[in-house]
Amino acid sequence: MNDLCADIGYKSINHVGEQLCGDHVDIVEQGDGSTVIVLADGLGSGVKASILSTLTSKIISTMLAAGLPIEECVSAIAATLPVCSVRGVAYSTFTIIHLRNNETAELIQYDNPQVILIRDEKNFEYPRTEMNIGGKKIFKSVIKLQEDDLFIAMSDGCPHAGIGMSYNFGWKREDIAAFMETICVAGYTAKTLSTILIDEVNKLYGGKPGDDATACIVRIRKRVPMNLLFGPPSNRDDCDRMMSLFFSKEGKHIICGGTTSSIAAKYLGKPLKATLSFERSDIPPIAEIEGVDLVTEGVITINRVVEYAKDYIEANTEYAEWSMKRDGASLIARLLFEEATDITFFVGRAVNPAHQNPDLPINFNIKMNLVKELSECLRKMGKHIKVSYFYGVRNHEKIRYQGAVPQVQGASRGRARRVEPHAA
């Protein structure tokens, strides 16, 4: 079984003075375990470029995902794109990375900077075949994937950075490759790598980008399962069953909540060791149970993780905060955002009497909403999510399972796609 998966992340900066980005990235997951990633760069900048790039990426990704050949995609783009009233042309460059079951990558490139492949921590020169489709020179490559392969797709705003300032002729492709070689060894996620690259591009522009710039990074890695337990079941008789299912799962185990951790400690026959050292005044301290990878408080900690997750899939400005700190929320964020690819939530639906105080901004619905929000954010990152809710039912014991959270529509900012379904 292929246990590789693709961690996909991207970031863009706009041309100075523009509200919209003229680059667009679209990602479509296919039912056969394949993924189509399209980075399009519209002619010029601003609204017109945004329309051109969005149409291009949407048309190509949708048609390729449906199994249509690239020739038909290019013809459809030529017939669909609106013509620029100033230049008299309809034009958008594009880069396509088509991952087939995470075994091979098909690269199709038209007028964007050539995709960089970092393999074994070095810039790897791969073969390219030239095609002529509708008068357009298009390059195609087919590459067999290896673990730790790193694909770097860019719009031309990246190599143009620093022209006339730091560099006479811009930040050349080989210089960008050398820069990425030095940081890829740190094991950063694709989202973090794209953020580092675009931040460097922005510096070379002196904080005033002369063009839209986008970096989309695909990192090939092994699948990593992880399990998070949040709250006890509403039926006390289901505690042992819930714990048995939770601890039988492959991967690391995270427990959130005071009552939940006490039940887990009793089930394991191990002491619950609370720590009184506050890493942060606004996040409760963590605890320890032998056999459990991380034990934290519940609602307050998870609420902060949700805040981090929302920022991570957008601007990723809070990375420096949670990537280094040792509080419960930061530790959970690192495990879920950076390490895990397949995450199973075990959610108990017991009502905590302490949360029924009308003076507290915490109630049962907030707890359930936190699970929903976090699950949706993680899916936007490309994680494979399964949520199991534990209900108590009169006259008989029953555990009700809710399957994977529905796919959230819209392009994501950071994704890590699984290869095979994660068994319940």
Identify the role of each PLM range:
Residues 1-20:
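Regulatory cytosolic signal-relay segments
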Residues 103-104, 248-253:
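Short active-site oxyanion
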Residues 160-244, 248-250, 270-405:
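C-terminal catalytic subdomain
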